[in-house]
């Protein structure tokens, strides 16, 4: 029976890829036995309740092998992956896109494809489960109690982010993380002996992982035994499973020819004969469906039913905790944050927005028990520390400060995994210039619709002495170009509070907070509520103004000072604070016209960064005071003056406009 089911997985993959004339059959054919063993013997999921929060998680880090996952989901009974959807693999509007997409297909626990990120994301799942278990489980009531499983390939393990995450997972002793390594000695360009020769198991042992070797990737009992041993090890686990890529293909197995191209009609026929598969394309024997129903769907449904009874009993035994748990199960924060939670701020108060962020962050932490995060070894520079808590580790699982170490990329992907798990609000910080190290993770936050908050400090050339390696220039423009990402660069402490509020209230959009090291003065015109619009009028000295200054962050202070100088010269000026271009762009046309009336063409945008995205607001007849070169090393006042960020220079720029 098991051999028939394994071959059903293989041929669903082969047939769908042939029909699409696109895809990666090799991993489907080689990894089918380990995937079958995992799904039918270990994985606890309920296809009728795909979002069950206590289900085991499965991450196909080798996302190019997506038909392996779709075949498993189809056979297990997930409604989203019908046979018609399998036949529509890689087609417009299908539930079976080329790489798995979270939120698009029920049963897909994470978007994967960029290699390495799946392993790192799984680390976040495991850490989320551990925190929620520590916080809410009580004796006899293991409400949060599941494993996170991964199938990865050689390419995943070559990527640096998997190494960062593996080092971190070993440090944290995340013992409910089990990685199955599809070790087939082949990559796209040829054999791994030409590009990847270290002992992976030795490396993972050094990280503090349990490791094992299954020498025959078709030995279902050996695979099952290795997984059971891993679960009892008390460590994160890597199981190397030696497989043959394209297993069963007489002329292509064991070669890179089967990695990323359909088998084609002739080789498919030969493979059918070699594996004894006497069925038409997309024909699956009834006994295969029965196998998956008994060993995946029914087993999972029984586990779900037992868990729901456990939750009901938990409500009786622990009613106060149960209220929070119920909210988490429903996908809500256990406590609602409100604007009134933030203290009022006096005009004229001066503080660096990184410090304002620390104050706001701690307001959030005091209100939300499931709010946690950390920094890439910069917590006391990014000001990301929750003051009431210590560091989280295996011995202190309830603490909410996470020390990610100098692992920016892993930090971003771990945060994604924690957000994907559900039940948590998470954040992570580093210097803004180092956002490049984790930009791929930020992109996947946005693609997956995850409300992760990124705290990026030291936001401009005002860093000064550290020089151009530490002074962001192109970073704002680059992040603003990512769809479904809200970038906030607040002007003062008041706007910083509001930006944090917007971040925590977000449901499907990640947030980037771009913050200063230098002090900024709270302006009289800044407004907590209006930050929700992305831009608003912060200063105006005449109703019939003929000049608009648009600024973000620290430059709002500069723009207001310049506007007051222009007013003293008889100028009629409006200053617009635009903490988030992304949010402003989402407003309706009437609001945009209210803030930036089309009739007023005399406009200057002011921001210490690349100028390219500002011309959409000032037009070709306006001007931008920005920076399109790298920064410099000198005391901050000198650097700012040399780059023209002075009241005198801005006033002159405005006066030179027609």
Segments and roles (model prediction):
Residues 89-95, 375-381, 388, 406-409, ...:
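Short glycine-enriched loops at secondary-structure junctions
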Residues 78-88, 170-182, 205-209, 446-461, ...:
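A glycine-rich helix N-cap at a beta->alpha junction
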Residues 20, 56-57, 108-111, 141-159, ...:
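A short, small-residue-rich loop immediately preceding and capping a beta-strand
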Residues 470-473:
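Flexible, small-/acidic-enriched active-site or ligand-binding loops
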Residues 1-32, 151-152, 156-157, 178, ...:
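Conserved acidic/glycine
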Residues 91-103, 127, 131-134, 140-145, ...:
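Thiamine diphosphate
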